[in-house]
From Swiss-Prot:
Gene Ontology CC annotations of this record: ribonucleoprotein complex; ribosome
Family, similarity comment: Belongs to the bacterial ribosomal protein bS21 family.
Superkingdom as given in the UniProt entry: Bacteria
GO biological process: translation
Protein name as catalogued: Small ribosomal subunit protein bS21A
Keyword Ribosomal protein applies: yes
Pfam family, one: Ribosomal_S21
UniProt KW keywords: Ribonucleoprotein, Ribosomal protein
């Protein structure tokens, strides 16, 4: 899990900004969005195959 410790003389806004960067870099938000709804295994395979054809990341 992403963790950010507040440094001395550091504002809350900058700590929140660092936290958001860590969350995005770790891919947590995209994982949450992906798991919002159940995806049938056949549709998951179809989506991954489409992404592979496009040359994107899986």
């Amino acid at each position: 899990m992403a963790e950010v410790r507040l440094g001395e003389n550091e504002s809350i806004d900058s700590a929140i900004r660092r936290f958001k960067k860590k969350i995005q870099k770790a891919g947590i938000l995209s994982e949450v969005k992906r798991r919002e709804r159940y995806e049938k295994p056949s549709l998951r395979r179809k989506r991954k195959a489409e992404a592979a054809r496009k040359g994107g990341r899986n």
